[in-house]
Amino acid sequence: MRKLVNANIMKGFFRSTLLLVAAALSVVSCSKDGERGRLSFEKSALFFMAGETKSVKFSASDVRSLTISSKPAEWGDPVINTETKTVRITAPAPNTEGAAESGTLTITGRGDNGRSVSASIYVSISRTVDMSDRPANSYLVNSRQTNYLFDAMHAGDGTTALETARLQIIWQRPSNLIEYLTLDEEGRASFFVGADDDDEGRIKQGNALIGAYDTKGNLLWSWHVWAADYDPDNRGTVSFNGYEMMDRNLGALADSNASSDDVLNSFGLYYQWGRKEPFIGPGTYDFSNGTSATLYDDEGDVVSLSVEESSAETGTVDYAREHPLTFIAGVEASEYDWMWGSHSEALWSDAKTANDPCPYGWKVAPAAAFAGLTIADPLEGVSADEYFDKYGWTLTDGSAESLFMGAGRRIYLDGRFQNIYVNPDSERQVRNVAMYDQPWVGLYWTTDISSSQSSAFYFFFNKLHVENSRVEGPVLHYRANGMPVRCVADR
C-alpha cells in the first residue's frame, strides 16, 4: 500500500480533481450443510472528489452483524446502512497529512452458519480525465494514477450509435495495464491506469484494446488505449512539409534507439492498410524469433493472434471489426489486399475517416508529409557495426529532424515479421524462413493509394555498403501488409 506521508506531496497531489477507485471483491462462506453467506459490492469502481461523501451499494444474503474490518489511513469512518444496503465513505480532504493514497476498505459479517464472510474494496486517491468529447478509435493517456472515461455508446467517429451492454479487454500489454474497466451509468467506458512499477512519478506504459459487446456477446467496436509518458502537445512533434507530425510511431513507448529496450519500445504497433485495429510488435528488438510480443486478457491469461486468408467472408470491414485479433492475409484473388471485393479507397484518406487509427485531432500521414526527407546520420567512412543494431535513421528535411524506426513489416501472406533490406519492386519480396528477420528497413503506411495497392514511405540500411543506405520515398505495397503509422495533426 502506497502512502502519502509528506504534507507537501499531499498539497500538490490534491490540486486536481480526486477520485476514489474501488475494485469489488466478494468472499463467500459455506457450511457443511449447504448454508452460506454472500457479500459483495455492486460496483467495481466509485469515484470521489476530495472530501466528497458518496455511498456504494452492496448485496448480502444470509449475512448478519456487519462491521467495518479495515479502511485506509485518514479516510473517513465508513457507515453501513443495513436497510438500504449501502456503505457511505468519505475521501480525505485536501492536504490531509498522513493520508494513505490507496488501501482496502473491508466489511465483514457472519453467515447464518456462524462463519465469517467479507467483501473488500480497493480505494485509491486519483484524478479523472473525461475524453467523451474527443471521439476516436484510439486514446492517448499519459497521466499516472488516473481514471479515464470515453464514450462507449458511439463508434470512433462519434456519431454511429452502439448498443453497448458490456466492455471487455480484448488484449493488453503488459498484463494489468488497464484496471477497473466498467461501463458507467452514462454509457462511458471507465478505466484506471496506475504508476510505473519502477518510477511512481510516471504512468504505467503499454497498449490495450477495449471491446464493446451487445447483450448477445457480439463485438460491436473496439478502441485502442495508448498509455505512454508522451504528450504531443508539449514539444512532442516535428514539422515536415507543412505537416505537424508526432515524433514517434503510433503506439510507441519511446522514441530512441540508444539501447535494445529503447529500440523495441520505439517500434509501436502495426496496421493493415485501412484497418483501425492494431497488431502488437515483435517480441524482441532484433526480430530474432519472428514472433509477436505476448498479449494478455483481463484475467492475465495469454491471448493469441490468428491468421485467416482473405475471402468473401473474411475480407470485409465488418469481419475485420469483429475479429481484431485476426490478421487477414492477402491472396492472389484479392490482389493481396486484406479486403476481398472492391479495394476501398475511403478507409483511410487525407481527411480523417471513421477507420482512422490515430487519436482525436490526429490522422494517418499522407505521403506528402514525408517528401524530401534524407538521412541525417553520417554514412561515409563508418562501419556497418555502428548502425547494425540501431534499427532506425534520424531523418531530416534540412531544418527539422526525427528518428524513424526500421521496424520492418508484418508480411501480407501470413502476418509474420519481416525486416530485411530487399528491393520492394523486385519479385523477391517473399523470402523463405531462413531469410526472415534480418536488419533492417523502415516502412510506414501513408494514406496515398494507387489501384489495389497503397503507398508506403520507405528507407533502408545497407549493411554491406553503409554509404548506399538511403530513403526511397513512397513505394507501392500490398494492403494486407502490416506496417507502422505516423500521425499528423488534423487541424
Model region roles, listed by residue range:
Residues 2, 20-47, 114-126, 487:
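Bacterial Sec-dependent N-terminal signal peptides
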